[in-house]
């Protein structure tokens, strides 16, 4: 029987609203990704504060579960991991002009390079610190975003070869990023893989030998083992959200549950209306619950009158507009089965019938990445180890 991560969802005492992150789910997901990688190393991406889950805590969980390296966008994100005592290899790949790479070199952060200008700035820091830089070159294979374009790649290789000869850099990796993150069968993936393979061979021909090559995102890690190269670079799957929602959960366990306490229960009469603009009017006598979170906390205003929350095991519809600090749900007529202080689950894994981040994404016309990176403000992030049960 498979072990499934289950997290108790009771609110932390004294917390008004909470984003509970199940670190056991993170570990489960990374172990699954390591299995899917089939011998390739796993770089767990913890950028954007761990996709809203907390970079430090999720990085530790990912490393404990078998991830070999960590990936972030910015040097500051990498330095925050170092400041927390994380010593595993960390790669940062998004840099503004004029960045000071010296703190990164002193902290042993690997630098991703997308242009010769970035290489020149890095070499300035190498000279200033006396530290050799470990670099990964990011190449553009079709996304037309970050990365060295094919036309500039030959001159970049020449500059890299010169820097290697001067013992200024160690060429650790070659990386690229996929266009179709959620379509593993899209033929563009194969076009990109071939371009990436060609650029890897071109580097060898020019005397630049990279230790590792990595192209695969979460989707490719889970469904395209032929694209694994030496390392895979999953992001959203680390947090238990399916990189291909049409294929179901793919064995992943969502790690985040967002919930709050019921602040107030009240009754209204048929014909009375709720919240700004009176966009919802009760058709019968009913009971309402007030939830003390709003759009300032990452509860999208556009979900007003459309979202559902789970209270005492039942889904309840939100009614009226979502306000800055609060919104209202309809409990229905009769004697209320919800009391002040009860727990309201806005979204979670869905294992107990509660809405999921994917449900919110469908309502919003967006992706679940945006949903889980949105909780903020008065929503306190907390962590619990999972209990493991047999299914």
UniProtKB/Swiss-Prot annotation:
Record key words, sorted: Isomerase, Pyridoxal phosphate
Full protein name: Alanine racemase
Entry GO CC: cytosol
Catalytic activity reported: L-alanine = D-alanine
Annotated pathway: Amino-acid biosynthesis; D-alanine biosynthesis; D-alanine from L-alanine: step 1/1
GO biological process, one term: D-alanine biosynthetic process
Binding site for substrate: 145, 324
Purpose of the protein: Catalyzes the interconversion of L-alanine and D-alanine.
UniProt-annotated catalytic positions: 47, 276
PROSITE patterns, A to Z: ALANINE_RACEMASE (PS00395)
Pfam families the record matches: Ala_racemase_C, Ala_racemase_N
Activity control summary: Inhibited by cycloserine.
């Amino acid at each position: 029987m498979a072990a499934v991560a289950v997290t108790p969802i009771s609110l932390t005492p004294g917390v008004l609203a909470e984003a509970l992150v199940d670190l056991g789910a993170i570990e489960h997901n990374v172990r699954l990704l390591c299995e899917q990688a089939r011998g390739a190393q796993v770089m767990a991406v913890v950028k954007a504060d761990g996709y809203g889950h907390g970079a430090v805590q999720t990085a530790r969980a990912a490393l404990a579960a078998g991830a070999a390296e960590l990936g972030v966008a910015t040097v500051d994100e990498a330095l925050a991991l170092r400041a927390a005592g994380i010593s595993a290899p960390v790669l940062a790949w998004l840099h503004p002009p004029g960045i000071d790479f010296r703190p990164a070199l002193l902290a042993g952060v690997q630098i991703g390079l997308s242009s010769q200008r970035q290489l020149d700035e890095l070499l300035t820091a190498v000279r200033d610190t006396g530290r050799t830089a470990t670099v990964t070159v990011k190449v553009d294979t079709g996304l037309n975003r970050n990365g060295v374009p094919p036309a500039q790649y030959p001159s970049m290789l020449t500059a890299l070869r010169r820097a290697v000869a001067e013992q200024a850099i160690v060429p650790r990796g070659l990386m690229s990023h996929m266009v179709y993150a959620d379509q593993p069968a899209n033929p563009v993936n194969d076009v990109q893989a071939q371009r990436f393979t060609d650029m890897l061979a071109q580097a060898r021909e020019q005397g630049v030998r990279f230790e590792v090559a990595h192209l695969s995102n979460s989707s490719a890690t889970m469904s395209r083992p032929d694209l694994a190269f030496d390392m895979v670079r999953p992001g959203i799957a680390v947090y238990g959200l399916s990189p291909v929602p049409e294929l179901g959960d793919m064995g992943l366990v969502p790690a985040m549950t967002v919930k709050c306490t019921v602040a107030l229960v009240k009754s209204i009469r048929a014909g009375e209306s709720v919240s700004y603009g009176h966009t919802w009017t009760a058709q019968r006598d009913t009971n309402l619950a007030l939830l003390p979170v709003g759009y300032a906390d990452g509860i999208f205003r556009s979900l007003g009158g459309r979202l559902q929350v789970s209270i005492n095991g039942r889904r309840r519809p939100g009614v009226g507009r979502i306000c800055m600090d609060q919104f209202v749900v309809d409990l229905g007529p009769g004697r209320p089965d919800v009391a002040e202080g009860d727990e309201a689950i806005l979204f979670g894994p869905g294992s107990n019938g509660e809405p999921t981040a994917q449900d919110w994404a469908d309502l919003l016309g967006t992706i679940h990445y945006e949903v889980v990176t949105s909780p903020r403000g008065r929503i306190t992030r907390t962590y619990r180890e999972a209990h493991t049960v047999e299914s």
